[in-house]
Amino acid sequence: MKEYQTITEVSGPLVYVETDEPIGYDEIVEIETPNGDVKRGQVLESSDGFVAIQVFEGTEGVGKDASVRFLGETLKMPVTEDLLGRVLDGSGNPIDGGPDIVPDDRVDIVGEAINPHAREYPEEFIQTGVSGIDGMNTLVRGQKLPIFSGSGLPHSDLALQIARQASVPEEEAETDDDEGSEFAVVFGAMGITAEEANEFMDDFERTGALERSVVFMNLADDPAVERTVTPRMALTTAEYLAFEKDYHVLVILTDMTNYCEALRQIGAAREEVPGRRGYPGYMYTDLAQLYERAGRIEGKEGSVTQIPILTMPGDDDTHPIPDLTGYITEGQIMMNRDLNSQGVTPPVNVLPSLSRLMDDGIGEGLTRADHGDVSDQLYAAYAEGEELRDLVNIVGREALSERDNRYLDFADRFEAEFIDQGFKTNRDIEETLDLGWELLSMFPKTELNRVDEDLIEDHYVEDVADEATAD
């Protein structure tokens, strides 16, 4: 351990120290003020005779008379299976009044990239209970699928719904012999308000979801530096549960926009040359280091699946945060302000949404043999209904044909019955696909040109078709 009393400057969350020997990058630091307060920090920059330290608890009370101790190790997360059911702050310290954590191991939070040769291709279905995701943009085990939201949209409610309802159907079907991997959720909240934190905790405790979850909470009034640590703590915990304890882990990170704002704030304090819109030029690399920690490893039973949630400033999907996120991840779920204003919950707009790995996680033996065809036909019918809505604004509904009016009715029913399920309803994939067939049966069989004829014979609902014809 090396100790110095050579602080030269304190600037925002950063402390600058003169040293007479090399100090390691990312090394953990303790800063003790004259009145005995101890703050933790991390080496952000190290050069000959000079070190910049980012302080997790903020630099209030730190002056040039403070002592700086370099501990000779990087930041580590104490990991154990007993973390399930616990609530921690953004730095990994318990805040739920429970006992201290007795770790099985202490793991570097930076993590290591999964060897591409050792990666298994993501496949197998994760059920969220949300039809707009399960039916149309299926989440696959080992995937990273972000949710793009906007300010004021209920992305927090959707995050809680997914955390509460998510499951691996094949594990639900396991018998009592305890074979197979269990399912767990790691929930990392960054820069949230105290009101949101209370809402999250009330929901987790009321629904019993906390028992299979590890929750990390970084509040809006916590230091920005801690915000950069929180997702790494969460992912380190998820990797331990997945690859050491064979859990299938779903990691929900909200809000990644707050994380990127913390990067910008720290970059400004360091007087770095800014990139697009003031964000640091290395933000793409930084985000990739987080998102690429999702996946499956050959020979390991567990998996890490990620749902990062971000709010697009000004609903702009070309903003650097959603833009760079889209390059790294495997699709996106888009929330829509117009649907939200109509009272549709969750307001998921399926048309611009995409799950690039969906085809690998659906079909016979995974969900159901008709899943792909049903999804394709629902997309096509809803897209045509949306186009006709624009036409109605010009010529009026009376000018449209019977066929066109049927597509308009379908679009209305699709939003009202398929998408709008509320935040409390948990639909399994069978219910979702059956509902899809009920809606598609509004059309004559000849209109279902994206569905195999055998599947039409098996699932087409004749009663609905008769009602539609009568109308």
Curated annotation (Swiss-Prot):
Keyword Membrane applies: yes
Principal place of residence: membrane
Coiled-coil region: none
Example GO molecular function: proton-transporting ATP synthase activity, rotational mechanism
One GO-annotated biological process of the protein: proton motive force-driven plasma membrane ATP synthesis
Topology of this chain in the membrane: Peripheral membrane protein
Domain of life, per lineage: Archaea
Compartment annotation: Cell membrane
Pfam entry (one): ATP-synt_VA_C
Gene Ontology CC: plasma membrane; proton-transporting two-sector ATPase complex, catalytic domain
Keywords: ATP synthesis, Cell membrane, Hydrogen ion transport, Ion transport, Membrane, Transport
Family according to the record: Belongs to the ATPase alpha/beta chains family.
Subunit structure: Has multiple subunits with at least A(3), B(3), C, D, E, F, H, I and proteolipid K(x).
Role summary: Component of the A-type ATP synthase that produces ATP from ADP in the presence of a proton gradient across the membrane. The B chain is a regulatory subunit.
Record-given protein name: A-type ATP synthase subunit B
Protein's organism: Halobacterium salinarum (strain ATCC 700922 / JCM 11081 / NRC-1)
High-level lineage: Archaea, Methanobacteriati, Methanobacteriota, Stenosarchaea group, Halobacteria
Gene: atpB
